[in-house]
């Protein structure tokens, strides 16, 4: 029983072994002898290396990849250096011609009289007032000569002693106005808080600054605050409304200050001599009176026969001391055609006088006698 139990424990302990331990324990066992002899161990040796390379968590593959990339970059850099080999530095030359649209031209070297190709990307210091990189025809420049694909090329092009190049006259200039210049609000200058505090402090203390300080402060204010002159004047009302007062009768009276100054004569009947009586004056400056035709006066219609007789009767009944009836008065329509009795009272309620003759004359006596 004891031997069987020991065998069971040994089997249970060997089952849960990790694969790494099994792999580590495998090389310790002696390798089986093969009939070939020494050739078998040489063939079995590369197996661990293949296992490490195939392991996804291993570091051998990324290291090899990074090394290959670095080597390729170094090779490319070396090839570029080999292509852009520097032949001369700080060489002076004269621009033969330069096309701004295409962006390339040629420079004639002063030492060897050789034409060197120049591209706009080779210009190192451009004119700050120019929008595009360029060099002007006949301009003296300083540059480095490098070996290009088709011949000598210019690089690091600047003016003499490293100053910016002048540029071509055909190149576009940059905009001259400052950003936001036209968007500024044009109005009177703003008051500075510091100046207001200084003025307030001087007035509160109760003494005036000396004359020299006033001169300096005035000059400083002129420098700080530019004089603002409006281009047009704003008038709310016409000038004839200024200095005048209006009353209920629409009479235009001068300002009291003008009366005190003696510009207008004495007052007569409550109205000064210089004042003029005018029609109704409107305060609204946009008011326009209605158009009235100024033609000849219209003729009045001739009075009717009955109206003429009434006027004669009124003149006869009214005495010399009685006031005349106002003009334009017309009697009602009902009283026009009524026959008036001889002794009827007049319109004013007074009876006709005894001495006055009746309005209707009697028939002549000759006719009466003949009738009898």
From Swiss-Prot:
Summary of the tissues where the protein is detected: Highly expressed in skeletal muscle and heart.
Location of the CSD domain: 93-157
SMART domains, per database record: CSP (SM00357)
Modified residues (N-acetylserine): 2
Basic residues bias (residue ranges): 222-238, 327-340
One CC-aspect GO term: cytosol
Gene Ontology molecular functions: mRNA 3'-UTR binding; nucleic acid binding; ribonucleoprotein complex binding; RNA binding; RNA polymerase II transcription regulatory region sequence-specific DNA binding; small GTPase binding
Post-translational modification Phosphoserine, affected residues: 2, 34, 134, 201, 203-204, 324, 346, 369-370
One Pfam family this sequence matches: CSD
Any single GO BP term: negative regulation of transcription by RNA polymerase II
Transcription regulation in keyword set: yes
Role description: Binds to the GM-CSF promoter. Seems to act as a repressor. Also binds to full-length mRNA and to short RNA sequences containing the consensus site 5'-UCCAUCA-3'. May have a role in translation repression.
Record's subunit section: Found in a mRNP complex with YBX2. Interacts with RRP1B.
Name this protein carries in UniProt: Y-box-binding protein 3
């Amino acid at each position: 029983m004891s031997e069987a139990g020991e065998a069971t424990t040994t089997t249970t302990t060997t089952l849960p072994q990790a694969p790494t331990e099994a792999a580590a324990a495998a090389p310790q066992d002696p390798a089986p002898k093969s009939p070939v002899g020494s050739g078998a161990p040489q063939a079995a040796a590369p197996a661990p290396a293949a296992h490490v390379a195939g392991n996804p968590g291993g570091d051998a593959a990324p290291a090899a990849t990074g090394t290959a990339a670095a080597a390729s970059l170094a090779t490319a850099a070396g090839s570029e250096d080999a292509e852009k080999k520097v032949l001369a530095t700080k060489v002076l030359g004269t621009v033969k011609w330069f096309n701004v649209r295409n962006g390339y031209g040629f420079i004639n070297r002063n030492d060897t009289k050789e034409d060197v190709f120049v591209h706009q990307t080779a210009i190192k210091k451009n004119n700050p007032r120019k929008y595009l990189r360029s060099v002007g025809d006949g301009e003296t420049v300083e540059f480095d000569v490098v070996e290009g694909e088709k011949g000598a090329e210019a690089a690091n092009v600047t003016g003499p002693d490293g100053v910016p190049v002048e540029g071509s006259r055909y190149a576009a200039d940059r905009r001259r106005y400052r950003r936001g210049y036209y968007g500024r609000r044009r109005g009177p200058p703003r008051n500075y808080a510091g100046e207001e505090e200084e003025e307030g402090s001087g007035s509160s203390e109760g003494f005036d600054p000396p004359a020299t300080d006033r001169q300096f402060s005035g000059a400083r204010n002129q420098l700080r605050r530019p004089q603002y002159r409006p281009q047009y004047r704003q008038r709310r009302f016409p000038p004839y409304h200024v200095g005048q007062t209006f009353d209920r009768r629409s009479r235009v009276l001068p300002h009291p200050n003008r009366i005190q100054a003696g510009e207008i004569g004495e007052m007569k009947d409550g109205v000064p001599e210089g004042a003029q009586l005018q029609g109704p004056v409107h305060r609204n400056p946009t008011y326009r009176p209605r158009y009235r035709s100024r033609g000849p006066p219209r003729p009045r219609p001739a009075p009717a026969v009955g109206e003429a007789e009434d006027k004669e009767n009124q003149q006869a009944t009214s005495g010399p001391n009685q006031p005349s009836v106002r003009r334009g008065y017309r009697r009602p329509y009902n009283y026009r055609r009524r026959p008036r009795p001889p002794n009827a009272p007049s319109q004013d309620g007074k009876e006709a006088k005894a001495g006055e003759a009746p309005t209707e004359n009697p028939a002549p006596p000759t006719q009466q006698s003949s009738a009898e």
